[in-house]
Amino acid sequence: MDLFPAIDLRNGKCVRLHQGDYGQETVYGDDPVAQALAFADAGAGWIHVVDLDAARTGVPENRDVVAAIAAAVPVPVQTGGGVRNRAAALALFDAGVERVVVGTAALADPDFVRDLAADHRVAVGLDAKAGEVATDGWLVGSGRSVLDVARSFADAGVDAFVVTDISRDGTLEGPDLVGLREVVEATPVDVIASGGVGTIADLRALAEIGVGGRRLAGVITGKAIYEGRFTVAEGVAALEIES
């Protein structure tokens, strides 16, 4: 089970939002590349990068920063935010990104995801409010449930589902263990949890989720690390102990 330290980009800086609210932003640094290197040096096996500006507008305003991170770190980079078409995805792969997360476009154009997943590593972002998948930077409800969308992509060849509980994101109040277990149970696709992690105990609880011998593939965490709740090394160790 992998730990994915998160770097959320807005105006080229490392930030975190509270419950996906662009009006509740905390800036944690103005050198995302240095932050990514620090995460990798501390033992992270992946770096998770989100372009928050692109997630809202579809314009890849931080693509150069994403490319600089991918070029600098010795571990694979997973990135999402505003990947609305094949050209945008290919630009990220060309920049050295290992896996692209597609959210809004996955619901609007499922065939785009299926075609891209045929020859690239793709994850589908399932960002939910009260069980409903949200799109366009978490601002628009889709009318579809997480389980419905997950099942619709079960045979699409995607690498993973990144499941985020928007109401918990940036709160440090703990992840939605029940909802995550339901997604693991519903499809054979790897599931990466995101949102709400605040303690080492939360990581251990996530590592204990198991259905039919399957477990979560990973967990994304940002604020807990930035706020000093635990270090990357401690997080990695917690997941290794329980896996």
Task: Locate each region found by the language model.
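Short, acidic/polar
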Residues: 28-40, 85-90, 142-152
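Structural preference for beta-strand elements that scaffold enzyme active sites
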Residues: 2-6, 46, 74-78, 98-101, ...
